[in-house]
């Protein structure tokens, strides 16, 4: 089958575009201080090797090596590591350091100087995107310090405003001229193509002028200026069977020349070219304008010091079942996390990298509290309403397990109190220095729908997002309504200013093979993927610019280098 027809199968539906856009890319620089000295007559000759961990199999694979720097315990490596960055993924990294003793590329032939484990989010989320960590791995020895800095690559935050027109396109309609539109594809590493933009249809003309459109350089070519961009020209048909007119290829570098004779493209239909000797083309497409704009990115705010505050709220209603019974969604299995624990850990372990103090408020709702059995929809899991903060995700898990032993599951399922709890904090910080993420884990049918909608509409004006994970077998129709992807949430005639709710049913992520690590990585990816855009939509709407990052660390330079 002609590969062209495969690639156009989805041209009618471009709603999933955002999922296909690659992450931004960051450049990680490595410096070390006070490395171990393994050489007898001189100082060590260090090299740093980066390993990345696979999500499913947890295997470490070598990603790259710096150069060797001769005779120093304080190297500032020149060669950088360029990594794809996804906010919604936990990207585990390992930096191994060696003292190079020969030209051999085999690392076992060199002296091990120690290693550091971290996540890419940890580096990016540190103040000024600069992380210092002790080097470990040699018992009883002080191995020195590693300094890791992350810098977003400039090409990843550029967007392009482009406009095209066409001349003398083939006539495809029996009773009139064509109704042309353009479809843009970026090429992938494996030679396949991914759709990245579709223009509007211009009706009944062979010489259309399309409206200017804006697209990020990441979406257009993944930041690679020489990567092929394929453009297909179609004649629109009401029944969706659009007629192929022809195609051409270009690249970002060619387009960046702007309007010129280099940017007039012949539209060619390969089938016609193969059959007809006199065939030249099916018309031409001309670039009318090309303007590059640099956009402020999520990482600009993080680097400037914006903190993400994470709060969890857990459903303690009786519909979860008696926690002492294995059938309960709150059952404490000594060998395996329950669904609540898995959801907390999956999302929390990623978000915690962006919160400097790692102290998280943890709330519960729908339970009777000791000693008097009053019903609460906003209680502290640690039992301290004045200070509901828990130390790290592990602290949240401990408080959750402790409270299961002391409270009585009851009802009803009310969300509004915990949403309003976080909104009170968010409403006091509107300068862009903090953003709040509330994770609600629930088993069910919501009881206070009207109040919850009102809370969401009010919260949509504040620096906050809400993630809802539904556990158990219930129907979650009401949650889908709160998600607001299809219809914006409204209350009393007022619509939410922006979409701030993301809902996912936990059952969609239960891995039949029992690989919980992989299924939880997928859960975290899906619930967190929208956060950076929700964050930016708040900052843009309020006209808040990122704070300047602290001045970059500039260590003293060393000149001697050897390649390995």
From Swiss-Prot:
Source taxon at top rank: Eukaryota
Domain C2 as annotated: residue spans: 1-133, 142-265
Residues the entry annotates as binding Ca(2+) 5: 173, 235, 237, 243
Pfam families from the UniProt entry: C2, Copine
UniProt binding sites for Ca(2+) 3: 101, 104, 109, 111
GO-annotated cellular components: extracellular exosome; plasma membrane
CDD domains given in the database record: C2A_Copine, C2B_Copine, vWA_copine_like
Cofactor dependency: Ca(2+)
PTM sites of type Phosphoserine: 260
List of residues binding Ca(2+) 1: 39, 45, 99, 101
Binding locations of Ca(2+) 4: 173, 179, 235, 237
Keywords recorded for this protein, A-Z: Calcium, Metal-binding, Phosphoprotein, Repeat
Residue ranges of domain VWFA in the record: 309-510
Coiled coil segments of this chain: none
SUPFAM superfamilies in the cross-refs: C2 domain (Calcium/lipid-binding domain, CaLB), vWA-like
GO biological process, one term: cellular response to calcium ion
InterPro entries on file: C2_dom, C2_domain_sf, C2B_Copine, Copine, Copine_C, VWF_A, vWFA_dom_sf
Details of cofactor binding: Binds 3 Ca(2+) ions per C2 domain.
Residue numbers binding Ca(2+) 2: 39, 99, 101, 111
Family of this protein: Belongs to the copine family.
PANTHER family: COPINE (PTHR10857), COPINE-8 (PTHR10857:SF133)
Function: Probable calcium-dependent phospholipid-binding protein that may play a role in calcium-mediated intracellular processes.
Protein name, per record: Copine-8
Lineage, highest ranks first: Eukaryota, Metazoa, Chordata, Craniata, Vertebrata
């Amino acid at each position: 089958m002609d590969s062209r027809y495969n690639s156009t199968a989805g041209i009618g539906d471009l709603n999933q575009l955002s999922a296909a856009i690659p992450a931004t890319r960051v450049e990680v620089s490595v410096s070390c201080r006070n490395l171990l000295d393994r050489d007898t007559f001189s100082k060590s000759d260090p090299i740093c090797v980066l390993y990345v961990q696979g999500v499913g199999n947890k295997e470490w694979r070598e990603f790259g090596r710096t150069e060797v720097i001769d005779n120093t315990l304080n190297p500032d490596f020149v060669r950088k590591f360029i990594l794809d960055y996804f906010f919604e993924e936990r990207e585990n990294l390992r930096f191994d350091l060696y003292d190079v003793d020969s030209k051999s590329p085999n690392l076992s032939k060199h002296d091990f100087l120690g290693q550091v484990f971290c996540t890419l989010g940890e580096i990016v989320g540190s103040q000024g995107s600069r992380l210092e960590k002790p080097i470990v791995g040699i018992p009883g020895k002080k191995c020195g310090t590693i300094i890791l800095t992350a810098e977003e690559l400039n090409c990843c935050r550029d967007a392009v405003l482009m406009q095209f027109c066409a001349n003398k396109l083939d006539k495809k309609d029996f009773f009139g001229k064509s109704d042309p539109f353009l479809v843009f594809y970026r090429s992938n590493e494996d030679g396949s193509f991914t759709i990245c933009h579709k223009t509007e249809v211009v009706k009944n003309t062979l010489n259309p002028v399309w409206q200017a459109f804006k697209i990020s350089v990441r979406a257009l070519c993944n930041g690679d200026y020489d990567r092929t961009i394929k453009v297909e020209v179609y004649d629109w048909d009401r029944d969706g069977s659009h007629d192929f007119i022809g195609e051409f290829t270009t690249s970002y570098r060619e387009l960046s020349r702007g309007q010129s004779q280099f940017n007039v493209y012949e539209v060619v239909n390969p089938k016609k070219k193969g059959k007809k000797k006199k065939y030249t083309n099916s018309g031409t497409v001309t670039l009318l304008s090309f303007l590059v704009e640099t956009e402020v990115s999520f990482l600009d705010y993080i680097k400037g010091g914006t903190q993400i505050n994470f709060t969890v709220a857990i459903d303690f209603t009786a519909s979860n079942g008696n926690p002492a019974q294995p059938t309960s969604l709150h059952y404490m299995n000594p060998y395996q996390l329950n669904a609540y624990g898995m959801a907390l850990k999956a999302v929390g372990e990623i978000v915690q990298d962006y919160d400097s103090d790692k102290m998280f408020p943890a709330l519960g709702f729908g339970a009777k509290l000791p000693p008097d059995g009053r019903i609460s929809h906003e209680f502290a899991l640690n039992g301290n309403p004045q200070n509901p903060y828990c130390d790290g995700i592990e602290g949240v898990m401990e408080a959750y397990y402790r409270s299961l032993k002391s409270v009585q599951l009851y009802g009803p399922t009310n969300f509004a109190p915990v949403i309003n709890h976080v909104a009170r904090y968010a409403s006091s910080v509107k300068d862009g220095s903090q953003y709040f993420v509330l994770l609600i884990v629930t088993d069910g049918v919501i009881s206070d729908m009207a109040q919850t909608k009102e809370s969401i509409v009010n919260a949509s004006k504040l620096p906050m997002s809400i993630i809802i994970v539904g556990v158990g077998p219930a129907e979650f129709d009401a949650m889908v309504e709160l998600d607001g992807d299809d219809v914006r949430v409204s209350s009393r005639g007022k619509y939410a200013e922006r979409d701030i709710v993301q809902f996912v049913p936990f059952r969609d992520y239960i891995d039949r093979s029992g690989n919980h690590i992989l299924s939880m990585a997928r859960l975290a990816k899906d619930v967190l993927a929208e956060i950076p855009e929700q964050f930016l939509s708040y900052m843009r709407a309020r006209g808040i610019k990122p704070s300047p990052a602290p001045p970059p660390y500039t260590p003293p330079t060393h000149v001697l280098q050897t390649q390995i």
